[in-house]
């Protein structure tokens, strides 16, 4: 995808009051150095609604906005909101009194709010920054009307994490097939480990497991058609996904629906768990936050299930920034975005961010660690990448699937799978025909 995908083909076809009450505000107004910034916007201030609420991500974002101020001479006031709260209240936030700029996601999630008239097009910004990105990055930033609405910053892969020292000590081998993966999980359980750390209290993490199983079993095209309801949720292919997942559940951390992913990651850090399937944006970031041994952390791409598709696909979500329709200082906000859409801006952000990878063409990031270098390589091997269910599907459908998957986790029986598929299809018909 994008810079991180290294030119792979077929990529990713790809309330306001509550937010204010829950937010913290930081101002970036450095005066020294930098170039750019016009007399018309210099000294003005823009507000930035941010869901970068985890400590490590918040620090990296502060570095980016400070650099943006230095370059553009525009002050930035950041209003940080808990990540999940931001997402849950985004519609009422944008309809109310939003900040000038806000953090958001590429693909369908961007297109949805653009189509609702809640964001301003950024074609003039892209005229200036377009040469910094490949066509796939631009595609992921383009609305259904053909206009650009997002300036991307980074992407990151969803992969299976493990501690190198633990694998070496116990003589474990990285699995490349489903059978090897299940066999390894059984061995870990026998050895007294939690084979796979797992959490879904927040609802969205388990969507990633559905995504990867669906792409491994049925392929990328099938997955994207399912996300747009061109394939019914009662299809046999969906049943196969849940059946494979049910085979794996005895080896995943119990009580997942009552646990947040941060706590699951801590069991991996403590070497109580052998593996964890999640994004680098979460697990590697948590290692940094907890000052755990990041050098010991490694990952492998999810093993092959159907040889027809191998390991050709993965979720590699792209995050970036949008301009709200109700922005009070549009010109200054665009000046900030013109800086953010550059290689030097991404490099500045990635000096602190030790888990994501940038998208700009020719990006040079001397600070990339082993996880980031491997992320670039593995995303680059993909024939296509998805954005994640809550970005590729209608938001209402993704929300419905959160509840359905949590019910599946509680009861993975064959009868319940069939019942949940029917429920998903009934809700999909209502959502996609409305």
Q: Language-model segments: what does each one mean?
A:
Residues 107-158, 209-211, 298-299:
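Hinge/lid segment of periplasmic solute-binding proteins
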Residues 168, 381-434:
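Conserved C-terminal helix/tail region of periplasmic/extracytoplasmic solute-binding proteins
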Residues 99-100, 130-165, 194-197, 310-313, ...:
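A structural signal for short loop-to-beta-strand junctions that line the ligand-binding cleft
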Residues 149-153, 158, 182-230:
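Extracytoplasmic/periplasmic solute-binding protein
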Residues 51, 109-111, 243-329:
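Extracytoplasmic/periplasmic substrate-binding proteins
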Residues 187, 227-257:
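Glycine-centered hinge/linker elements that transmit conformational signals in sensory
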Residues 3-111, 116, 257, 292, ...:
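Conserved N-terminal structural module of periplasmic/extracytoplasmic solute-binding proteins
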Residues 119, 124, 281-288, 319-395:
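Mature extracytoplasmic/periplasmic domains
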């Amino acid at each position: 995808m994008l810079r991180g995908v290294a030119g792979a083909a077929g990529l990713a076809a790809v309330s306001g009051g509550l937010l204010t009450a829950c937010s913290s505000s930081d101002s970036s107004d450095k005066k020294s150095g930098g170039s750019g910034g016009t007399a018309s916007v210099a000294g003005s201030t823009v507000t930035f609604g941010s869901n970068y609420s985890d400590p490590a991500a918040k620090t990296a974002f502060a570095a980016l906005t400070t650099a943006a101020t230095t370059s553009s001479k525009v002050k930035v006031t950041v209003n940080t909101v808990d990540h999940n709260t931001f997402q849950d209240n985004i519609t009422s936030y944008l309809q109310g009194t939003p900040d000038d700029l806000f953090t958001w996601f590429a693909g369908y999630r961007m297109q949805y709010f653009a189509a609702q008239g809640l964001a301003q097009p950024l074609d003039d910004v892209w005229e200036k920054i377009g040469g910094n990105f490949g066509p796939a990055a631009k595609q992921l930033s383009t609305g259904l009307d053909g206009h650009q609405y997002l300036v991307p910053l980074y992407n990151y892969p969803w992969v299976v994490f493990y501690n190198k020292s633990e694998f070496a000590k116990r003589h474990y081998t990285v699995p490349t097939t489903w059978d090897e993966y299940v066999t390894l999980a059984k061995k870990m359980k026998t050895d007294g480990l939690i084979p796979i750390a797992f959490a879904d209290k927040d609802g969205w993490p388990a969507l990633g497991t559905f995504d990867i199983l669906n792409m491994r079993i049925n392929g990328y095209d099938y997955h994207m058609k399912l996300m747009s309801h061109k394939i019914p949720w009662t299809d046999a292919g969906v049943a196969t996904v849940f059946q494979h997942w049910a085979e794996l559940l005895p080896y995943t951390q119990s009580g997942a629906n009552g646990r947040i992913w941060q706590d699951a990651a801590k069991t991996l850090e403590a070497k109580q768990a052998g593996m964890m399937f999640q994004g680098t944006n979460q697990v590697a970031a948590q290692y940094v936050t907890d000052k755990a041994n990041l050098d010991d952390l490694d990952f492998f791409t999810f093993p092959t299930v159907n040889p027809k598709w191998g390991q050709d696909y993965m979720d590699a979500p792209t995050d970036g920034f949008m301009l709200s329709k109700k922005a009070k200082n549009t010109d200054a906000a665009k000046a900030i975005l013109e800086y953010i859409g550059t290689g030097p801006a991404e490099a500045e952000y990635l000096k602190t961010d030790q888990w994501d990878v940038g998208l700009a063409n020719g990006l040079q990031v001397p600070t990339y660690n082993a996880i980031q270098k491997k992320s670039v390589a593995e995303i680059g091997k993909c024939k296509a990448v998805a954005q994640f269910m809550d970005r590729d599907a209608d938001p209402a459908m993704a929300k419905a699937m959160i509840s359905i998957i949590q019910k599946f986790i509680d009861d993975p029986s064959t009868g319940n799978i069939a019942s949940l598929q029917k429920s998903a299809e009934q809700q999909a018909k209502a959502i996609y025909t409305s």
